[in-house]
A protein has these predicted regions:
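Patatin-like phospholipase
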Residues: 1-180
Length: 180
């Protein structure tokens, strides 16, 4: 039996905290479980091992939410708050199975207080193979080529992070915002 796990910060519960469409275990983030919770959120089934023994959780294996949790068309923010959403792409497609449907978009009132941070198309085009590394790289490239490309992308992303910090420190973020 699968059960969802929502790790949350008690100071700021997400607007979807009380959803009940699937069995849901709610776990408060703490210094003792933060690292394991982040590791579990990236543990892609059949690719990376799940995480066991996370402090404050029921027994079991914790891993990436997969099909039911990718880009749900739900409100991202409470009315008076904003959500900062780092993402690979400059758009959000609700529904994991619909990600190839380029015209599918979330309901506007679900993302009207979302600040999406993503690399530009020009940045991605300059990366090795003109794309962001993904799990298909394991099948498409030999290990040495895959590692080389991933390291180049990490270096490029370090520069991107430095640029973002500079924009924030100089209070230039508002000038860079575009409507979703």
């Amino acid at each position: 039996v699968f059960e969802r796990a929502l790790f949350y910060d008690r100071r700021d519960r997400p607007p979807f905290f009380d959803l009940d469409g699937f069995p849901l275990q709610r776990i408060e983030l703490s210094p003792g479980n933060l690292e394991d919770a982040v590791a579990a959120s990236g543990a892609i089934p059949l690719v990376l091992a799940g995480v066991r023994g996370i402090e404050g959780t029921a027994r079991g294996v914790y891993r990436d939410g997969g099909i039911i949790d990718y880009h749900l068309d739900l409100p991202h923010s409470a009315d008076e708050k904003f959500t900062l959403y780092p993402h690979f792409f400059g758009h959000i497609v609700p529904g994991w199975f619909d990600k190839k449907l380029k015209n599918r978009r979330p309901q506007p009132h679900h993302i009207d207080r979302t600040i999406l941070i993503s690399p530009s198309d020009e940045f991605v085009a300059r990366l090795p193979h003109g794309k962001i590394p993904d799990r298909r790289d394991f099948a498409n490239f030999e290990p040495a080529e895959r590692v080389r490309a991933w390291k180049q992308c990490i270096a490029a992303c370090d520069q991107l992070a430095d640029e973002f910090l500079e924009v924030v420190e100089k209070e230039q973020l508002a000038a860079r915002l575009e409507p979703l």
